[in-house]
Amino acid sequence: MAKKSKIAKNEQRKVVVERYAAKRAELKKALVDPNGTDESREAARLGLQKLPRDASPIRVRNRDAVDGRPRGNLSKFGISRVRFRDMAHRGELPGITKSSW
């Protein structure tokens, strides 16, 4: 079980990323625009730097939806490998069977 403060901080980051997503996308588009001038690119770069650090989506950590475990996350299911194994053994994941050959 992850610390509740770490889980809360990650949720707060998700909110910040969502809040600045449109502005960030606009600045990134201006940064790589082939028709843009050097001044507009410089302005876009400075604008991007002025955004909060947590506005970058790379700062959001994928965590287990049940207990918040940060490592070994299976993104298709949204849970960690440990939780996945337990749930699969108990038959709580429909369509998941243990391999045997």
UniProtKB/Swiss-Prot annotation:
The keyword Ion transport does not apply. GO terms for biological process: translation. The keyword Ligase does not apply. Keywords: Ribonucleoprotein, Ribosomal protein, RNA-binding, rRNA-binding. One of its GO terms (cellular component) is small ribosomal subunit. Part of the 30S ribosomal subunit. Contacts proteins S3 and S10. PANTHER family: 30S RIBOSOMAL PROTEIN S14, SMALL RIBOSOMAL SUBUNIT PROTEIN US14A. HAMAP family: Ribosomal_uS14_1 (MF_00537). This is Small ribosomal subunit protein uS14. It comes from Leifsonia xyli subsp. xyli (strain CTCB07). The lineage of its organism: Bacteria, Bacillati, Actinomycetota, Actinomycetes, Micrococcales.
